[in-house]
UniProtKB/Swiss-Prot annotation:
The keyword Kinase does not apply. This is Protein LSM12. Residues 176-194 have a biased composition (Polar residues). It holds the Pfam family LSM12_LSM. Residues 1-71 form the Sm domain. It is found in: Cytoplasm. One of its GO terms (cellular component) is cytoplasm. Disulfide bonds: none annotated. Nicotinic acid adenine dinucleotide phosphate (NAADP) binding protein. Residues 79-173 form the AD domain. The lineage of its organism: Eukaryota, Metazoa, Chordata, Craniata, Vertebrata. Coiled coil: none annotated. GO terms for molecular function: RNA binding.
Amino acid sequence: MAGPGEYFAIGAYVSCRTCQETRLQGEVVAFDYPSKMLALKCPSSSGKPNHADILLLNLDYVSDVEVINERTQTPPPLASLNITKLASRARLEKEEKLSQAYAISAGVSLDGQQLFQTIHKTIKDCKWQEKNIVVMEEAVISPPYQVENCKGKEGRALCHVCKIVEKHFIDMENQKGVQRNPAQQSQKETSTSS
């Protein structure tokens, strides 16, 4: 392990033994001294060319660490970040969280919140209007959020939204059935063994 004040240079080749007695060897891609975490780029375990495994190692749990080859060149520059794309992603995440918070504060049922999330995965243009879900400004789903509660302009958009709502509740019922079956099975086993 690196001693006090010692660091692993990015690009250096390192070898070490894990607590499971596995010998690892790879290129250092990151090292955090305070947490003693080392990230190694190793040949792909799948054997695919042009692929690599990135392993995160806690140096408290490895032994026989040795630097095989120090990096002699300066490391390549860091990849540039697309700030516009990152800002857009952050804005969308914030809007989603605010939408969830609004639904909770408005007293929307859990079924309504789950349906909104299901619709939002497929159609981003959906929002809350009090306790109603408004989709593409063409369909409105009011509590208790069933297919018969879908209203709007007749057409493909409303039909599509109704299909999403119907499938959502079928999937929810199937999930509940799967969760109930193990409990029912154990009850049957208990009653037959009595």
